[in-house]
Regions:
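Hydrophobic/aromatic-enriched cytosolic interaction surfaces used to assemble or bind macromolecules
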Residues: 1-259
Length: 259
């Protein structure tokens, strides 16, 4: 981590991450991986998202500068995806509400993911979206899932086997199945117990017809009780790999794949 020279802020990329668990932002130089800073900001859980966001923007000196690019990541479980060849812009709200009931003051946004060949739809609080647009008019807004999905799409082309990727967070398990770059499944489960995670992962493995001997299972994120999780999975699967945990959130780290 390094001190940013804000007189040269237009050479840097600002990435803001908004989650119910807390806010954070990263400033980095696209041509220098080591030239970055990462700052976290706590939220008051008795306040609304928009109220917390107003405080965050006002309290953060770094947001007063102009940047080469500004990215905003929204952490929300309300997301779904559509194969790009079936997607129509004018139907995005209708498609989204096939999967999630309508919610007051929600705006539906879309990320076109070229490497995964899907359109990812996600919901954002309407007032927060307006506030973000006012303060960061040129920002690109992503679901936190989007850069992770694109990163795995690239990695899945390596080798000649299918891959199940599991990204673990405190209360959430995000799963992605790829067949040499082609997305076969994307799903998320609210769970934090090791037994529940093992159940969902093995269920997906079976339902997708993956090979215990040939295909691969990759784990990333906050892997609590890692030894227990590995021991249970290794009873059934041969090729299990754990990705190194980065110093910053995995979705911010992989955001470069959406550049």
């Amino acid at each position: 981590m390094t001190v940013i020279d804000f007189s040269k802020s237009e050479q840097y990329t600002l990435s803001i991450r908004l989650s119910a668990d807390g806010f954070s932002f990263s400033i980095y130089h696209p041509q220098a991986d080591s030239d970055y800073t990462y700052i976290t900001y706590p939220v008051n859980k008795s306040y609304s998202l928009t109220a917390n966001l107003k405080e965050f923007i006002c309290a953060t000196e770094a947001f007063k500068y102009s940047y080469r690019k500004t990215n905003i990541l929204i952490d929300t479980p309300r997301f779904t995806f559509v194969p790009f060849e079936l997607f129509e812009d004018e139907c995005q709200d209708e498609i989204f509400h096939y999967n999630f009931p309508p919610k007051d003051n929600e705006t539906i946004l879309c990320n076109i993911l070229g490497k995964s060949n899907v359109a990812l739809l996600f919901g954002v609080n309407k007032h927060s979206h307006q506030l973000l647009h006012e303060h960061f008019p040129n920002a690109r807004i992503f679901s936190c899932v989007s850069p992770v999905l694109e990163h795995f799409a690239i990695k899945s082309k390596e080798g000649n086997c299918r891959k199940l990727y599991a990204h673990l967070r405190r209360d959430l398990l995000e799963t992605f199945v790829f067949d040499k770059g082609k997305l076969m499944l994307c799903n998320a489960f609210n769970c934090k117990k090791t037994a529940d995670r093992v159940y969902y992962l093995l269920y997906i493995w079976q339902q997708q017809g993956l090979s215990q001997d040939k295909d691969q299972h990759h784990l990333s994120g906050e892997i609590e009780n890692k030894e227990e999780l590995l021991a249970e999975l290794q009873k059934f699967l041969r090729n299990i790999f754990i990705m190194p945990k980065p110093n910053i959130p995995f979705d911010i780290q992989t955001l470069l794949t959406c550049e």
